[in-house]
Regions:
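Pyridoxal 5′-phosphate
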Residues: 1-327
Length: 327
């Protein structure tokens, strides 16, 4: 990114500065393509996954489920496909969308039914994702979900799939997304993609999964009525979504923040909305349970000491809640 910050050239220009900027963009495109199992020509850089979903789904007639991200739900019939108590979609053919992994529960959709679009944002970098093996015509990924900069993402799209340009202008990104490319952001995206690919090859997330599972076991030992959402399904290795009786999610967020831990009640994209998780309600949980849920996310460098510290803070705070309830 530092090299990109020093360049003043437009990647569409033919002079030396422009060619240097273009080379950075194309190098990043190759790294992103390698991470997601796509051809470089199938990677279209955007301002993020929200824009990528709009480009892919605008003017389409698609079926999906209520556990999809809001940026996807805006363009689909989200009542068409039901999910079970683990958040797994019922198989369905036709023009469908699929969230590869849920941002709140981490539940992975293992079937290959999506014919139109896949939201791969949460999955990429944490579990293997291969666009070439997907049935979908398009998919979305985002840089900040793999440790890259915010405000840059990519649309993965088959060369055979026609889509109408939604950002009109100079025809950049092979005519699929106009506007001068964010060279600095794209450079960071490429570097993050290369690092994420190495982490997957080195299986660094295996230790994260073990720590996550150990944390959940300790939480259940402390509170046997604690619910871990999606624990019977395949999940991302870094995500834990759980609810404890009598302790609302937003209160937990505040208590953990005071203790030095950044957790969330629902998806971070919906932070500030103090209401029950739409995803958990779609999975069949009641309003009170869904309102008591928090999500704890871990990184590939999370340590046992981090988990011990979190468990100490959480159990101490919940002990006070139980004391007030007389439990």
């Amino acid at each position: 990114m530092l090299e990109a910050m020093d360049l003043v050239g437009n990647p569409s220009s033919v002079h030396r500065e422009g060619r240097s900027a273009k080379a950075i963009v194309e190098n990043a495109r190759a790294h992103v393509a390698a991470l997601v199992g796509a051809e470089p020509a199938e990677v279209v850089f955007t301002s993020g996954a929200t824009e990528a979903a709009m480009i892919a789904l605008k003017d389409m007639d698609c079926a999906g489920s209520a556990v999809e991200h809001d940026s996807v739900r805006a363009w689909i019939d989200d009542t068409a496909i039901r999910v079970d108590g683990s958040g797994l979609m019922e198989p369905m053919g036709g023009a469908t969308t699929k969230q590869v992994a849920n941002s709140e529960t981490g539940v992975i959709q293992n079937h290959r039914d999506a014919q139109v679009f896949e939201d791969a944002v949460q999955a990429v970098g944490k579990t293997p994702y291969d666009f070439s093996a997907s049935l979908a015509a398009a998919a979305a990924v985002s840089a900040h979900k793999i440790g890259g900069p915010k405000g840059v993402g990519a649309l993965l799209i088959r060369e055979s799939h026609a889509t109408q340009m939604t950002v009109l202008g100079g025809g950049q990104e092979s005519g699929k997304r106009s506007g001068t490319e964010n060279v600095v952001g794209i450079a960071g995206f490429g570097a993050a993609a290369a690092a994420a690919k190495r982490d997957l090859e080195d299986d660094v997330w295996r230790q994260t999964r073990l720590l996550r599972d150990q944390m959940e076991d300790k939480l259940i030992q402390f509170e046997p009525d604690l619910i871990v959402f999606g624990d019977l399904a395949s999940r991302l290795p870094n995500t834990s979504c759980f609810a404890a009786p009598g302790w609302r999610g937003e209160t937990q967020v505040i208590q953990m923040d005071l203790a030095g831990f950044a957790v969330s009640a629902g998806s971070a994209c919906s932070s500030g909305k103090v209401k029950a998780s739409r995803v958990l309600l779609a999975m069949g949980f009641d309003e009170e349970t869904a309102s008591s849920a928090i999500r704890v996310s871990m990184g590939p460098r999370t340590t046992e000491e981090d988990i011990r510290s979190f468990l100490e803070a959480w159990t101490q705070a919940y002990s006070r809640v139980r004391a007030r309830r007389g439990g």
